[in-house]
Amino acid sequence: MNSVVTRAAIEPRPQAAAEEVVRLIDVKRRFGATPALDGISLNVNRGEILGIIGRSGAGKSTLIRCLNGLERADSGEIRIEGRDITGLQEQELQPLRGRIGMIFQHFNLLSAKTVEDNVALPLKIEGIAKAERLQRAHELLEVVGLADKAQAYPASLSGGQKQRVGIARALAARPALLLSDEATSALDPETTRSILALLRDINRKLGLTILLITHEMEVVRGIADRVAVIDAGRIVEEGQVWSVFANPQTDITRSLLGGIRPQLPDHILSRLSATTGSEVILSVDLAGPEAQGALFAELSAALPHSFRLVHGGIDHIQNQPVARFFIAVPAHEPALAGKVEQFLTARSARVEVLGYDTGHA
């Protein structure tokens, strides 16, 4: 049985059940003796953007291949718009795949076809009349900002432009679900931001449901409504993006967040001892109104001279303030660190004792 950390204690429950586009129930897939998916259960609601993040080899690619029917799950259910696809034959899967669009890391455009023809290709395969499919291609090129590139060939496009063509092609058949497999991994940061902004805009305007696979927390932060963390074929943590960023519950999530959350400076980290030192170093994670900074003024008033601020910062994710700070508490009074920790945790902060600073005078 999987141990999945959810955010029920800190996230309000919805007033009514949302319509599900995707539901996975205890999905398992093995390659020989190795479990690639080990009991995956999750859902994606209509109009939602769900980010699935994990390290290489965590099971992300297998999961997305099971969702579009390229891999068969060994057991469990994969429901797309209410229909379980796990037992469908290939001919039964074909119309269902028309409800699923896909964008890839390496674009997968046909070099001998124009941009217009690449976008129209799914409709050609469906047997749609030429005039209708070209009209649809022109509409989508307007959406992705490439109306002037209709007759260009992929070789003349930048990486970001190629991905925009890929997005337009994925939308050609008016899918209910868009799958994104590391779609920004080959792009520079500025282009990545523009592609994420485009996907968010499409999501809002069309109500398109998006499930994106990535190993980059910045991508999740930039676009997703919810995030699920996958490790060794299991969902180990999931919740709204802001709450996972503010209070990660598992080591793998904290590791994935390491590059974008404030970290204790190396020169202090190198001086930490588990047993003795002049100051106790605490990490303090906050979300919501308490993250705005007033909490430390209250702490200073309640316990004068009880701490100094070492490092940290405040961010805004999904319009929620999220903060992480590191504070140092004098170690000469053994009970003081406990009092500080108690004060902060009583006000919804997550506090962790990191150790003693042996180098601060």
Swiss-Prot record:
Its EC number is 7.4.2.11. GO terms for cellular component: plasma membrane. It is found in: Cell inner membrane. Keywords: Amino-acid transport, ATP-binding, Cell inner membrane, Cell membrane, Membrane, Nucleotide-binding, Plasmid, Translocase, Transport. Belongs to the ABC transporter superfamily. Methionine importer (TC 3.A.1.24) family. Part of the ABC transporter complex MetNIQ involved in methionine import. Responsible for energy coupling to the transport system. This is Methionine import ATP-binding protein MetN. The lineage of its organism: Bacteria, Pseudomonadati, Pseudomonadota, Alphaproteobacteria, Hyphomicrobiales.
